[in-house]
Protein backbone atom coordinates (compact mmCIF):
# COMPACT_ATOMS: atom_id res chain seq x y z
CA UNK A 1 0.00 0.00 0.00
CA UNK A 2 2.39 2.70 1.19
CA UNK A 3 6.05 2.00 2.02
CA UNK A 4 6.91 1.12 5.62
CA UNK A 5 8.67 4.21 6.98
CA UNK A 6 8.64 3.26 10.67
CA UNK A 7 12.46 2.90 10.85
CA UNK A 8 12.99 6.21 9.08
CA UNK A 9 10.47 7.95 11.35
CA UNK A 10 12.21 6.55 14.43
CA UNK A 11 15.50 7.90 13.02
CA UNK A 12 13.86 11.30 12.42
CA UNK A 13 12.52 11.43 15.97
CA UNK A 14 16.10 10.88 17.18
CA UNK A 15 17.43 13.67 14.89
CA UNK A 16 14.91 16.55 15.22
CA UNK A 17 17.59 19.18 14.43
CA UNK A 18 18.01 17.68 10.95
CA UNK A 19 14.84 19.52 9.85
CA UNK A 20 15.84 22.95 11.19
CA UNK A 21 16.46 25.21 8.24
CA UNK A 22 14.07 23.97 5.53
CA UNK A 23 14.01 26.58 2.74
CA UNK A 24 11.03 27.46 0.58
CA UNK A 25 9.96 29.78 -2.19
CA UNK A 26 6.65 30.37 -3.97
CA UNK A 27 5.74 31.41 -7.51
CA UNK A 28 2.12 32.39 -8.13
CA UNK A 29 0.58 33.08 -11.54
CA UNK A 30 -2.58 35.13 -12.11
CA UNK A 31 -4.27 36.65 -15.15
CA UNK A 32 -4.98 40.38 -15.27
CA UNK A 33 -8.66 40.82 -16.18
CA UNK A 34 -11.03 43.73 -16.74
CA UNK A 35 -13.94 44.59 -14.43
CA UNK A 36 -16.18 42.23 -16.44
CA UNK A 37 -13.66 39.37 -16.32
CA UNK A 38 -12.25 39.58 -19.85
CA UNK A 39 -8.53 39.20 -20.41
CA UNK A 40 -6.79 42.58 -20.06
CA UNK A 41 -5.55 43.82 -23.45
CA UNK A 42 -3.18 46.35 -21.87
CA UNK A 43 0.57 45.86 -21.75
CA UNK A 44 2.36 44.85 -18.55
CA UNK A 45 1.82 47.91 -16.30
CA UNK A 46 4.70 50.41 -16.41
CA UNK A 47 4.16 50.92 -12.69
CA UNK A 48 5.27 47.32 -12.04
CA UNK A 49 8.66 47.75 -13.72
CA UNK A 50 10.30 45.56 -16.37
CA UNK A 51 9.00 41.98 -16.42
CA UNK A 52 12.32 40.73 -17.86
CA UNK A 53 14.45 41.87 -14.93
CA UNK A 54 12.18 42.47 -11.89
CA UNK A 55 13.07 40.23 -8.95
CA UNK A 56 9.53 39.66 -7.73
CA UNK A 57 7.00 40.66 -10.42
CA UNK A 58 7.24 39.21 -13.92
CA UNK A 59 5.02 37.61 -16.56
CA UNK A 60 4.64 34.02 -17.67
CA UNK A 61 3.27 33.05 -21.11
CA UNK A 62 1.01 36.00 -21.85
CA UNK A 63 1.45 39.73 -21.42
CA UNK A 64 -1.59 39.60 -19.10
CA UNK A 65 -0.33 36.60 -17.08
CA UNK A 66 1.40 38.00 -14.00
CA UNK A 67 3.84 35.90 -12.02
CA UNK A 68 4.90 36.77 -8.48
CA UNK A 69 8.14 35.28 -7.14
CA UNK A 70 9.22 35.32 -3.51
CA UNK A 71 12.82 35.16 -2.33
CA UNK A 72 13.90 31.93 -0.62
CA UNK A 73 12.70 31.91 2.98
CA UNK A 74 13.10 29.76 6.08
CA UNK A 75 9.79 30.81 7.67
CA UNK A 76 6.37 30.03 6.17
CA UNK A 77 4.51 32.97 7.71
CA UNK A 78 7.23 35.40 6.60
CA UNK A 79 7.20 33.88 3.10
CA UNK A 80 3.42 34.25 2.74
CA UNK A 81 3.49 37.80 4.11
CA UNK A 82 6.11 38.74 1.52
CA UNK A 83 3.92 37.22 -1.21
CA UNK A 84 0.92 39.12 0.15
CA UNK A 85 2.89 42.39 0.08
CA UNK A 86 3.63 41.85 -3.64
CA UNK A 87 -0.11 41.27 -4.18
CA UNK A 88 -1.02 44.39 -2.16
CA UNK A 89 1.37 46.56 -4.15
CA UNK A 90 0.18 45.13 -7.48
CA UNK A 91 -3.52 45.51 -6.58
CA UNK A 92 -2.90 49.23 -6.04
CA UNK A 93 -1.12 49.59 -9.40
CA UNK A 94 -3.64 47.81 -11.64
CA UNK A 95 -6.14 50.65 -12.01
CA UNK A 96 -9.50 49.09 -12.83
CA UNK A 97 -8.04 45.64 -13.56
CA UNK A 98 -8.24 42.66 -11.23
CA UNK A 99 -6.28 39.47 -10.62
CA UNK A 100 -8.24 36.37 -11.70
CA UNK A 101 -8.56 34.14 -8.60
CA UNK A 102 -8.97 30.76 -10.35
CA UNK A 103 -6.58 28.45 -12.21
CA UNK A 104 -8.80 28.08 -15.28
CA UNK A 105 -9.42 31.19 -17.40
CA UNK A 106 -12.87 32.28 -18.47
CA UNK A 107 -14.24 34.87 -20.92
CA UNK A 108 -11.51 34.35 -23.54
CA UNK A 109 -13.42 34.42 -26.82
CA UNK A 110 -10.55 33.77 -29.22
CA UNK A 111 -6.96 32.57 -28.99
CA UNK A 112 -5.84 35.62 -30.97
CA UNK A 113 -6.95 37.81 -28.03
CA UNK A 114 -4.05 36.35 -26.02
CA UNK A 115 -0.99 38.54 -26.49
CA UNK A 116 2.39 36.91 -25.84
CA UNK A 117 4.54 38.34 -23.06
CA UNK A 118 6.98 40.99 -24.32
CA UNK A 119 10.37 41.66 -22.78
CA UNK A 120 11.84 44.55 -24.75
CA UNK A 121 14.32 44.66 -27.61
CA UNK A 122 17.31 42.82 -26.11
CA UNK A 123 18.24 39.49 -27.68
CA UNK A 124 17.37 37.60 -24.49
CA UNK A 125 14.01 39.43 -24.32
CA UNK A 126 13.17 38.61 -27.94
CA UNK A 127 14.33 35.01 -27.39
CA UNK A 128 11.86 34.62 -24.49
CA UNK A 129 8.99 35.96 -26.61
CA UNK A 130 9.88 33.68 -29.53
CA UNK A 131 9.93 30.68 -27.16
CA UNK A 132 6.34 31.62 -26.23
CA UNK A 133 5.46 31.94 -29.94
CA UNK A 134 6.67 28.35 -30.27
CA UNK A 135 4.52 27.23 -27.34
CA UNK A 136 1.49 28.93 -28.91
CA UNK A 137 2.08 27.28 -32.30
CA UNK A 138 2.74 23.86 -30.76
CA UNK A 139 0.02 23.61 -28.10
CA UNK A 140 -2.33 26.56 -28.60
CA UNK A 141 -2.35 29.77 -26.56
CA UNK A 142 -5.41 28.97 -24.43
CA UNK A 143 -3.73 26.13 -22.57
CA UNK A 144 -0.88 28.47 -21.66
CA UNK A 145 -3.18 30.90 -19.82
CA UNK A 146 -3.95 28.34 -17.10
CA UNK A 147 -2.50 29.52 -13.78
CA UNK A 148 -0.93 27.60 -10.93
CA UNK A 149 1.28 27.90 -7.88
CA UNK A 150 4.80 26.45 -7.69
CA UNK A 151 6.28 25.52 -4.33
CA UNK A 152 10.07 25.34 -4.12
CA UNK A 153 11.50 23.23 -1.29
CA UNK A 154 14.93 22.24 -0.03
CA UNK A 155 16.17 20.36 3.02
CA UNK A 156 19.08 21.81 5.04
CA UNK A 157 22.64 20.50 4.72
CA UNK A 158 22.29 19.26 8.32
CA UNK A 159 19.62 16.82 7.16
CA UNK A 160 21.85 15.35 4.45
CA UNK A 161 24.81 15.17 6.85
CA UNK A 162 22.75 13.12 9.30
CA UNK A 163 20.73 11.11 6.74
CA UNK A 164 23.31 10.41 4.02
CA UNK A 165 26.61 11.03 5.82
CA UNK A 166 27.77 13.81 3.48
CA UNK A 167 30.20 16.48 4.69
CA UNK A 168 29.33 19.35 2.36
CA UNK A 169 27.11 20.12 -0.61
CA UNK A 170 29.73 19.82 -3.35
CA UNK A 171 31.41 16.58 -2.27
CA UNK A 172 28.01 15.12 -1.34
CA UNK A 173 26.14 16.22 -4.48
CA UNK A 174 25.58 12.63 -5.72
CA UNK A 175 24.09 11.50 -2.38
CA UNK A 176 21.96 14.65 -2.03
CA UNK A 177 20.72 14.32 -5.62
CA UNK A 178 19.90 10.63 -5.01
CA UNK A 179 17.84 11.71 -1.98
CA UNK A 180 15.90 14.26 -4.01
CA UNK A 181 15.30 11.73 -6.81
CA UNK A 182 13.88 9.38 -4.18
CA UNK A 183 11.54 12.22 -3.18
CA UNK A 184 10.53 12.70 -6.83
CA UNK A 185 9.78 8.98 -7.38
CA UNK A 186 7.57 8.92 -4.28
CA UNK A 187 5.90 12.12 -5.48
CA UNK A 188 4.95 10.40 -8.74
CA UNK A 189 3.61 7.43 -6.76
CA UNK A 190 1.69 9.33 -4.07
CA UNK A 191 1.49 12.98 -5.12
CA UNK A 192 -2.12 12.52 -6.29
CA UNK A 193 -2.94 13.40 -2.67
CA UNK A 194 -2.23 17.06 -3.62
CA UNK A 195 -5.03 17.40 -6.21
CA UNK A 196 -7.27 15.29 -3.97
CA UNK A 197 -6.95 17.81 -1.12
CA UNK A 198 -6.26 21.06 -2.98
CA UNK A 199 -7.41 20.63 -6.58
CA UNK A 200 -9.71 23.59 -7.26
CA UNK A 201 -10.59 23.25 -10.94
CA UNK A 202 -13.45 20.69 -11.10
CA UNK A 203 -15.15 22.78 -13.80
CA UNK A 204 -14.26 24.85 -16.85
CA UNK A 205 -16.03 27.57 -18.82
CA UNK A 206 -17.51 25.99 -21.95
CA UNK A 207 -15.65 28.67 -23.95
CA UNK A 208 -12.41 26.96 -22.86
CA UNK A 209 -13.26 23.93 -25.01
CA UNK A 210 -13.67 26.14 -28.12
CA UNK A 211 -14.84 23.23 -30.23
CA UNK A 212 -12.06 20.87 -29.12
CA UNK A 213 -12.92 17.19 -29.08
CA UNK A 214 -13.02 15.64 -25.62
CA UNK A 215 -14.03 12.17 -24.48
CA UNK A 216 -14.72 13.42 -20.95
CA UNK A 217 -18.39 12.94 -19.92
CA UNK A 218 -18.98 16.57 -18.99
CA UNK A 219 -22.15 17.69 -17.29
CA UNK A 220 -23.29 21.21 -18.10
CA UNK A 221 -25.28 23.74 -16.19
CA UNK A 222 -27.09 26.72 -17.65
CA UNK A 223 -24.29 29.09 -16.69
CA UNK A 224 -21.81 28.24 -19.47
CA UNK A 225 -20.01 25.73 -17.31
CA UNK A 226 -18.81 22.17 -17.98
CA UNK A 227 -17.91 20.05 -14.98
CA UNK A 228 -17.30 16.51 -13.79
CA UNK A 229 -19.18 15.89 -10.53
CA UNK A 230 -16.23 14.20 -8.75
CA UNK A 231 -13.32 15.99 -10.47
CA UNK A 232 -10.61 17.75 -8.47
CA UNK A 233 -8.22 19.42 -10.92
CA UNK A 234 -9.06 19.65 -14.62
CA UNK A 235 -5.99 21.89 -14.84
CA UNK A 236 -3.88 18.74 -14.41
CA UNK A 237 -5.93 16.69 -16.90
CA UNK A 238 -5.31 16.32 -20.64
CA UNK A 239 -7.57 19.36 -21.08
CA UNK A 240 -5.15 21.42 -19.06
CA UNK A 241 -1.44 21.89 -19.16
CA UNK A 242 -0.06 18.51 -20.15
CA UNK A 243 1.89 17.43 -23.16
CA UNK A 244 1.17 14.04 -24.71
CA UNK A 245 4.07 14.27 -27.17
CA UNK A 246 6.45 14.25 -24.21
CA UNK A 247 5.20 11.02 -22.63
CA UNK A 248 7.52 8.87 -24.75
CA UNK A 249 10.73 10.79 -24.04
CA UNK A 250 11.88 8.03 -21.69
CA UNK A 251 12.81 10.49 -18.95
CA UNK A 252 13.28 8.75 -15.60
CA UNK A 253 14.18 9.97 -12.12
CA UNK A 254 16.64 7.34 -10.93
CA UNK A 255 19.91 9.25 -11.13
CA UNK A 256 21.26 12.60 -12.24
CA UNK A 257 23.13 11.49 -15.34
CA UNK A 258 20.38 9.43 -17.00
CA UNK A 259 17.87 12.22 -16.23
CA UNK A 260 20.09 14.90 -17.77
CA UNK A 261 20.98 12.69 -20.77
CA UNK A 262 17.29 12.14 -21.58
CA UNK A 263 16.54 15.85 -21.18
CA UNK A 264 19.44 16.84 -23.44
CA UNK A 265 18.31 14.27 -26.01
CA UNK A 266 14.85 15.87 -26.11
CA UNK A 267 16.25 19.33 -26.87
CA UNK A 268 18.42 17.89 -29.65
CA UNK A 269 15.95 15.47 -31.31
CA UNK A 270 13.82 16.86 -34.16
CA UNK A 271 10.07 16.23 -33.98
CA UNK A 272 8.30 15.35 -37.24
CA UNK A 273 5.31 17.42 -36.16
CA UNK A 274 7.40 20.52 -35.40
CA UNK A 275 9.52 20.12 -38.53
CA UNK A 276 6.21 20.21 -40.45
CA UNK A 277 5.21 23.37 -38.56
CA UNK A 278 8.37 25.05 -39.87
CA UNK A 279 10.78 27.57 -38.39
CA UNK A 280 9.51 30.63 -40.23
CA UNK A 281 6.54 31.96 -42.12
CA UNK A 282 8.15 34.48 -44.45
CA UNK A 283 10.22 36.68 -42.14
CA UNK A 284 8.24 35.73 -39.04
CA UNK A 285 9.80 33.20 -36.68
CA UNK A 286 7.37 30.45 -35.56
CA UNK A 287 9.50 28.64 -32.94
CA UNK A 288 13.06 28.54 -31.61
CA UNK A 289 13.75 25.20 -33.32
CA UNK A 290 11.95 22.06 -34.49
CA UNK A 291 13.12 19.77 -31.66
CA UNK A 292 10.83 17.83 -29.30
CA UNK A 293 11.55 20.53 -26.70
CA UNK A 294 12.65 24.02 -27.78
CA UNK A 295 14.43 24.47 -24.44
CA UNK A 296 14.51 22.37 -21.26
CA UNK A 297 11.79 24.44 -19.54
CA UNK A 298 9.27 23.16 -22.07
CA UNK A 299 9.31 19.74 -20.38
CA UNK A 300 5.93 19.39 -18.67
CA UNK A 301 6.29 17.77 -15.25
CA UNK A 302 4.35 17.86 -11.97
CA UNK A 303 7.67 18.18 -10.11
CA UNK A 304 11.16 19.24 -11.19
CA UNK A 305 14.69 18.89 -9.78
CA UNK A 306 16.35 22.32 -9.84
CA UNK A 307 19.54 24.27 -9.21
CA UNK A 308 19.94 28.03 -9.57
CA UNK A 309 21.67 28.61 -12.91
CA UNK A 310 24.69 30.81 -13.52
CA UNK A 311 24.79 33.27 -16.42
CA UNK A 312 24.55 31.41 -19.73
CA UNK A 313 24.10 28.01 -18.06
CA UNK A 314 21.26 25.62 -18.95
CA UNK A 315 19.20 24.03 -16.14
CA UNK A 316 20.69 20.59 -16.84
CA UNK A 317 24.27 21.89 -16.89
CA UNK A 318 23.61 23.52 -13.51
CA UNK A 319 22.40 20.15 -12.19
CA UNK A 320 25.51 18.39 -13.50
CA UNK A 321 27.75 21.04 -11.93
CA UNK A 322 26.30 21.10 -8.44
CA UNK A 323 23.64 18.39 -8.17
CA UNK A 324 20.02 19.01 -7.17
CA UNK A 325 19.66 22.07 -4.94
CA UNK A 326 15.89 22.14 -4.51
CA UNK A 327 12.62 20.68 -5.78
CA UNK A 328 9.87 22.58 -7.60
CA UNK A 329 6.36 21.25 -6.93
CA UNK A 330 4.04 22.18 -9.80
CA UNK A 331 0.74 20.43 -9.00
CA UNK A 332 -1.00 23.16 -6.98
CA UNK A 333 -4.05 24.85 -8.44
CA UNK A 334 -4.66 28.45 -7.45
CA UNK A 335 -6.32 28.36 -4.03
CA UNK A 336 -9.54 30.35 -4.63
CA UNK A 337 -10.10 30.70 -0.88
CA UNK A 338 -6.95 32.79 -0.43
CA UNK A 339 -6.39 36.31 -1.81
CA UNK A 340 -2.81 35.27 -2.66
CA UNK A 341 -3.68 31.88 -4.20
CA UNK A 342 -2.02 29.72 -1.53
CA UNK A 343 -2.13 29.45 2.27
CA UNK A 344 -0.12 28.24 5.27
CA UNK A 345 -2.06 24.97 5.60
CA UNK A 346 -0.99 24.00 2.07
CA UNK A 347 2.63 25.01 2.68
CA UNK A 348 2.81 23.01 5.91
CA UNK A 349 1.20 20.00 4.28
CA UNK A 350 3.74 20.13 1.43
CA UNK A 351 6.61 20.31 3.93
CA UNK A 352 5.31 17.18 5.66
CA UNK A 353 4.60 15.29 2.47
CA UNK A 354 7.94 16.12 0.82
CA UNK A 355 9.87 15.10 3.94
CA UNK A 356 7.90 11.82 3.95
CA UNK A 357 8.80 11.36 0.26
CA UNK A 358 12.51 11.55 1.14
CA UNK A 359 12.19 9.15 4.08
CA UNK A 360 10.03 6.50 2.38
CA UNK A 361 11.72 3.77 0.40
CA UNK A 362 11.39 4.41 -3.35
CA UNK A 363 12.53 1.63 -5.70
CA UNK A 364 13.87 2.83 -9.04
CA UNK A 365 11.21 3.42 -11.70
CA UNK A 366 11.31 2.58 -15.38
CA UNK A 367 9.63 4.97 -17.81
CA UNK A 368 6.82 2.37 -18.07
CA UNK A 369 6.15 2.51 -14.33
CA UNK A 370 6.22 6.29 -14.52
CA UNK A 371 3.34 6.02 -17.02
CA UNK A 372 1.51 3.63 -14.63
CA UNK A 373 1.61 6.25 -11.86
CA UNK A 374 -0.26 8.58 -14.21
CA UNK A 375 -3.33 6.31 -13.93
CA UNK A 376 -3.74 7.10 -10.23
CA UNK A 377 -3.27 10.81 -10.87
CA UNK A 378 -5.87 10.70 -13.66
CA UNK A 379 -8.32 8.84 -11.46
CA UNK A 380 -7.98 11.46 -8.71
CA UNK A 381 -7.98 14.38 -11.14
CA UNK A 382 -11.17 13.29 -12.94
CA UNK A 383 -13.14 11.53 -10.20
CA UNK A 384 -11.17 11.71 -6.96
CA UNK A 385 -14.23 12.33 -4.79
CA UNK A 386 -16.28 9.47 -6.24
CA UNK A 387 -17.64 7.26 -3.43
CA UNK A 388 -15.55 4.11 -3.09
CA UNK A 389 -12.74 5.47 -5.28
CA UNK A 390 -9.65 3.24 -5.33
CA UNK A 391 -5.94 3.69 -5.94
CA UNK A 392 -3.80 1.24 -7.93
CA UNK A 393 -0.71 -0.24 -6.31
CA UNK A 394 2.28 0.09 -8.66
CA UNK A 395 1.63 -1.39 -12.12
CA UNK A 396 -0.26 -4.40 -10.73
CA UNK A 397 -4.03 -4.88 -10.86
CA UNK A 398 -4.41 -4.72 -7.08
CA UNK A 399 -6.21 -1.69 -5.68
CA UNK A 400 -6.90 -0.12 -2.30
CA UNK A 401 -9.61 2.34 -1.26
CA UNK A 402 -8.30 5.89 -1.66
CA UNK A 403 -9.58 6.64 1.84
CA UNK A 404 -7.46 3.82 3.33
CA UNK A 405 -4.27 4.89 1.55
CA UNK A 406 -4.83 8.55 2.45
CA UNK A 407 -5.34 7.81 6.13
CA UNK A 408 -2.29 5.51 6.26
CA UNK A 409 -0.21 8.30 4.73
CA UNK A 410 -1.50 10.81 7.27
CA UNK A 411 -0.63 8.50 10.17
CA UNK A 412 3.00 8.84 9.01
CA UNK A 413 2.71 12.57 8.36
CA UNK A 414 1.42 13.06 11.92
CA UNK A 415 4.73 11.68 13.26
CA UNK A 416 6.74 13.97 10.98
CA UNK A 417 4.54 16.85 12.22
CA UNK A 418 5.42 16.11 15.85
CA UNK A 419 9.14 16.35 15.02
CA UNK A 420 8.68 19.61 13.07
CA UNK A 421 6.55 21.16 15.80
CA UNK A 422 8.87 20.21 18.67
CA UNK A 423 7.69 21.35 22.08
CA UNK A 424 6.95 24.97 21.10
CA UNK A 425 4.12 24.60 18.61
CA UNK A 426 1.41 22.35 17.23
CA UNK A 427 0.84 24.01 13.86
CA UNK A 428 1.95 21.05 11.70
CA UNK A 429 -0.09 18.61 13.81
CA UNK A 430 -3.15 20.85 13.47
CA UNK A 431 -2.73 20.76 9.67
CA UNK A 432 -2.71 16.94 9.78
CA UNK A 433 -5.82 16.80 11.94
CA UNK A 434 -7.65 19.28 9.71
CA UNK A 435 -6.77 17.64 6.37
CA UNK A 436 -7.13 13.95 7.26
CA UNK A 437 -10.86 14.58 7.75
CA UNK A 438 -11.14 15.08 3.96
CA UNK A 439 -10.72 11.32 3.46
CA UNK A 440 -13.83 10.59 5.54
CA UNK A 441 -15.71 13.52 4.04
CA UNK A 442 -14.69 14.50 0.48
CA UNK A 443 -17.02 17.52 0.77
CA UNK A 444 -14.23 19.19 2.78
CA UNK A 445 -11.85 19.20 -0.21
CA UNK A 446 -11.20 22.42 -2.14
CA UNK A 447 -12.79 20.97 -5.29
CA UNK A 448 -16.06 20.05 -3.56
CA UNK A 449 -16.28 23.43 -1.83
CA UNK A 450 -15.63 25.49 -4.97
CA UNK A 451 -17.88 23.33 -7.20
CA UNK A 452 -20.79 23.94 -4.85
CA UNK A 453 -20.46 27.72 -5.29
CA UNK A 454 -19.83 27.41 -9.03
CA UNK A 455 -23.03 25.42 -9.54
CA UNK A 456 -24.90 28.27 -7.91
CA UNK A 457 -23.15 31.26 -9.55
CA UNK A 458 -21.25 29.86 -12.55
CA UNK A 459 -17.46 29.99 -12.89
CA UNK A 460 -17.54 33.52 -14.25
CA UNK A 461 -19.74 34.69 -11.39
CA UNK A 462 -17.51 33.12 -8.75
CA UNK A 463 -14.33 34.42 -10.41
CA UNK A 464 -15.64 37.98 -10.70
CA UNK A 465 -16.98 38.05 -7.16
CA UNK A 466 -13.74 36.76 -5.63
CA UNK A 467 -11.58 38.98 -7.86
CA UNK A 468 -13.47 42.08 -6.70
CA UNK A 469 -13.45 40.97 -3.05
CA UNK A 470 -9.70 40.28 -3.05
CA UNK A 471 -8.97 43.49 -4.97
CA UNK A 472 -10.64 45.59 -2.28
CA UNK A 473 -9.08 43.58 0.52
CA UNK A 474 -5.52 43.81 -0.85
CA UNK A 475 -5.80 47.47 -1.87
CA UNK A 476 -6.80 48.40 1.67
CA UNK A 477 -4.18 46.38 3.55
CA UNK A 478 -0.93 48.12 4.53
CA UNK A 479 2.41 46.62 3.49
CA UNK A 480 4.03 44.60 6.29
CA UNK A 481 7.54 43.60 5.17
CA UNK A 482 8.29 45.57 2.02
CA UNK A 483 7.99 49.35 1.79
CA UNK A 484 6.72 51.54 -1.06
CA UNK A 485 10.30 52.87 -1.33
CA UNK A 486 11.77 49.37 -1.79
CA UNK A 487 9.14 48.47 -4.37
CA UNK A 488 9.62 51.73 -6.28
CA UNK A 489 13.40 51.24 -6.18
CA UNK A 490 13.07 47.70 -7.58
CA UNK A 491 10.70 48.97 -10.29
CA UNK A 492 13.28 51.57 -11.38
CA UNK A 493 16.22 49.18 -11.04
CA UNK A 494 14.43 46.57 -13.17
CA UNK A 495 13.97 49.12 -15.96
CA UNK A 496 17.63 50.11 -15.71
CA UNK A 497 18.73 46.45 -15.86
CA UNK A 498 16.61 45.86 -18.96
CA UNK A 499 18.02 49.01 -20.59
CA UNK A 500 21.59 47.86 -19.88
CA UNK A 501 20.88 44.44 -21.42
CA UNK A 502 19.58 46.16 -24.56
CA UNK A 503 22.70 48.35 -24.81
CA UNK A 504 25.05 45.41 -24.22
CA UNK A 505 23.94 43.32 -27.23
CA UNK A 506 26.63 42.99 -29.89
CA UNK A 507 25.02 40.24 -32.01
CA UNK A 508 22.02 40.64 -34.30
CA UNK A 509 18.99 38.58 -33.18
CA UNK A 510 19.56 36.11 -36.04
CA UNK A 511 23.17 35.58 -34.87
CA UNK A 512 22.03 35.22 -31.26
CA UNK A 513 19.40 32.68 -32.32
CA UNK A 514 21.94 30.67 -34.31
CA UNK A 515 24.08 30.49 -31.17
CA UNK A 516 21.37 29.80 -28.58
CA UNK A 517 18.34 28.53 -30.51
CA UNK A 518 19.36 24.89 -30.65
CA UNK A 519 18.48 24.40 -34.34
Swiss-Prot record:
InterPro entries: Gln_synth/guanido_kin_cat_dom (IPR014746), Glu_cys_ligase (IPR007370), Glut_cys_ligase (IPR006334). SUPFAM superfamilies: Glutamine synthetase/guanido kinase (SSF55931). One of its GO terms (molecular function) is metal ion binding. It is an enzyme of class 6 (ligase). One of its GO terms (biological process) is glutathione biosynthetic process. It catalyses: L-cysteine + L-glutamate + ATP = gamma-L-glutamyl-L-cysteine + ADP + phosphate + H(+). Keywords: ATP-binding, Glutathione biosynthesis, Ligase, Nucleotide-binding. Pathway: Sulfur metabolism; glutathione biosynthesis; glutathione from L-cysteine and L-glutamate: step 1/2. GO terms for cellular component: cytosol. Its EC number is 6.3.2.2. Belongs to the glutamate--cysteine ligase type 1 family. Type 1 subfamily. This is Glutamate--cysteine ligase. It comes from Yersinia pseudotuberculosis serotype I (strain IP32953). The gene is gshA.
Amino acid sequence: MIPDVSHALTWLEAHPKALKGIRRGIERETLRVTADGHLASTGHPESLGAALTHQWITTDFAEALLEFITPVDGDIDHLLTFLRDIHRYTARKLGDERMWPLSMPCFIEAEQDIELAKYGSSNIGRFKTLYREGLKNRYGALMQTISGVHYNFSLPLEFWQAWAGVTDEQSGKEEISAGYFRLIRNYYRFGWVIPYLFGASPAICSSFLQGRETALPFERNGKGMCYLPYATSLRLSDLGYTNKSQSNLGITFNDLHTYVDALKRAIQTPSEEYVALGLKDGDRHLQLNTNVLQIENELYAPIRPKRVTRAGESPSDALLRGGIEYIEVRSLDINPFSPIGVDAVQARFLDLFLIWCVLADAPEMSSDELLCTRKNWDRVILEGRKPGQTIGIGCSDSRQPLETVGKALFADLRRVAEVLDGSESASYQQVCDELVASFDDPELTFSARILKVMQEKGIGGVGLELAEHYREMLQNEPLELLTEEQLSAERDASRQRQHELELKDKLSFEEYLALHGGQ
